[in-house]
């Protein structure tokens, strides 16, 4: 299983590469000098950080905020006077905690069939004692990998929440554009370059705000036909034919 947070992170990183401003950035790929989320918020929003308009301003500035939402729980640098039970003055932190619900939701990715996990013992060869001519083999731990698996994850966009955050059709197209490239420039020792790829992106677009069908019914048209090797045959719903996009 792949977590929805991991999928959202990859989508956000891809949108940042397209020139969009992103609030939550990984340290190794950040596009500014901010040392923390608070630092980034203060740099962009300045003295408006404690304003009740922070949600609107944040959505205007950062694509990932108006898409996936964000919780701003930031302490103030200032102290506010408070009264103790005995009436004496006491200083306490003040701050802001504002939650923004984003219109884009991403589900966890599950393998189409049961996967086999290969476990490998990791050892190191070191000179423990003496003159260094003798080496001992020490176990460092275990490394687990999936040799092959086909995963699928589903998502949706809520028009009502999109109106609140200012999420537009242009933003939706930005997400659609980056999905086929989800694993590009995201390699690591656990995911070497070329070891993972997006096979297909199935993109449904309703012709009305409430939706022509429920999300569950739409997703079921793919779920019912998906084979272990990734082959599928869509049973399209009346009046709702998706766009099928090949991976990068």
What are these regions (language model features)?
Residues 1-248:
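RNA-binding basic/glycine-rich loop and surface signature characteristic of RAMP-family CRISPR effectors
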């Amino acid at each position: 299983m792949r977590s929805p947070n991991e999928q959202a992170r990859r989508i956000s990183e891809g949108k940042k590469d397209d020139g969009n401003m992103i609030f939550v950035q990984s340290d190794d790929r950040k596009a500014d000098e901010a040392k923390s989320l608070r630092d980034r918020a203060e740099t962009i929003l300045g003295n408006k950080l404690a304003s009740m308009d922070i949600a609107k301003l944040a959505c205007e500035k950062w694509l990932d905020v108006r898409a996936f939402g964000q919780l701003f729980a930031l302490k103030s640098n200032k102290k506010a006077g408070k009264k103790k039970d005995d009436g004496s003055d006491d200083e306490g932190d003040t701050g802001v905690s504002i939650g923004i619900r984003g219109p884009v939701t991403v589900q966890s990715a599950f393998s189409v069939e049961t996967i086999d996990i290969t476990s490998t013992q990791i050892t190191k060869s070191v000179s423990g004692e003496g003159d260094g001519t003798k080496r001992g083999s020490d176990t460092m731990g275990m490394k687990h990998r999936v040799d092959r698996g086909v995963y699928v994850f589903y998502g949706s966009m809520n028009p009502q929440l999109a109106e609140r955050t200012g999420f537009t059709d242009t933003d939706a197209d930005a997400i659609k554009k980056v999905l086929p490239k989800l694993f590009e420039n995201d390699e690591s020792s656990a995911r070497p370059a070329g070891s993972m790829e997006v096979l297909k992106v199935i993109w449904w677009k309703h012709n009305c705000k409430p939706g022509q069908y429920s999300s569950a019914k739409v997703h079921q048209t793919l779920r019912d036909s998906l084979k272990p090797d990734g082959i599928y045959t869509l049973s399209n719903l009346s009046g709702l034919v998706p766009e099928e996009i090949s991976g990068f």
